[in-house]
Amino acid sequence: MDHAADAHRTDLMTITRFVLNEQSKYPESRGDFTILLSHIVLGCKFVCSAVNKAGLAKLIGLAGETNIQGEEQKKLDVLSNDVFVNALVSSGRTSVLVSEEDEEATFVEPSKRGKYCVVFDPLDGSSNIDCGVSIGTIFGIYTLDHTDEPTTADVLKPGNEMVAAGYCMYGSSCMLVLSTGTGVHGFTLDPSLGEFILTHPDIKIPNKGNIYSVNEGNAQNWDGPTTKYVEKCKFPKDGSPAKSLRYVGSMVADVHRTLLYGGIFLYPADKKSPNGKLRVLYEVFPMSFLMEQAGGQAFTGKKRALDLVPEKIHERSPIFLGSYDDVEEIKALYAEEEKKN
């Protein structure tokens, strides 16, 4: 009997243990972040359970309301939003919440306030629920740097000021990918234990990938650099093999694959959406934060994505993120275009 292997299997690094270990590196820490994260983790477990039984519990149908983005809300969207708002408020560690589903920011009542602001998309890719495609929750965390009354300005900060970001993907397995600014780590939910276990320590994206991920249905509306780049992916002139196209249409699934296998995810501006489609605070920033922490890059077509300073909580931006070398290529095409102009 292999006792060493058995011991290894029973010495599980749960997400709570992992975050506590990180916390111990900072003697001045009071554990507020650990408590906040435990509430986010609970929200993810709740939503994972709801997603898994959505068809059976009739949570799939439209709720008959339209959210701030003009998208009809599904019941599961509404439920997920309620779960995360309640989990974050009850943690006693937040002051401002921004959700994709709510038109205005939520300001926590004074007695329950803490030093963090959380921006999140409670259920990204929810149009894919009916067909069982992977969907997910995306979140980013800022620190409140004053004790005055919180305002929207507390979250309208560049992404480089985030202290943590992550996503939870509800697919063939439930996986939570997290960065607190010291690398990227992946935790998989063990359903028998009800715990997220560290399965992907220190994720590093390959420097170059052979996959590109974009909605080619919008190709006729793209600008020059995006058109040239995708053409180059499909018909390389330097003798290298063509890249493969992989596009799910659920940002969490597409970015997750890009993070693990390498390549590039593109959601460019086009004639229909001149400012891009993805929201800066709770889609572009968290995913860009994770990509950079894993050794990749994130670019808006004009600048480093994390250097953007949003002016509105639901502001949108184009985004190109993924392997370092692949993003370098599209940056070069935009630089070329700028020289011409």
Swiss-Prot record:
Family assignment?
Belongs to the FBPase class 1 family.
The organism's lineage is: Eukaryota, Viridiplantae, Streptophyta, Embryophyta, Tracheophyta
Where does this protein hold substrate? D124, G125, S126, S127, N215, Y247, Y267, K277
Q: Which GO terms describe its molecular function?
A: fructose 1,6-bisphosphate 1-phosphatase activity; metal ion binding
Q: What is this protein called?
A: Fructose-1,6-bisphosphatase, cytosolic
Known cofactor(s): Mg(2+)
Query: Which gene name does the record give?
Result: CYFBP
Report residues binding Mg(2+) 3.
Answer: D121, D124, E283
Q: How is the cofactor bound?
A: Binds 3 Mg(2+) ions per subunit.
The protein's organism comes out as Arabidopsis thaliana (Mouse-ear cress)
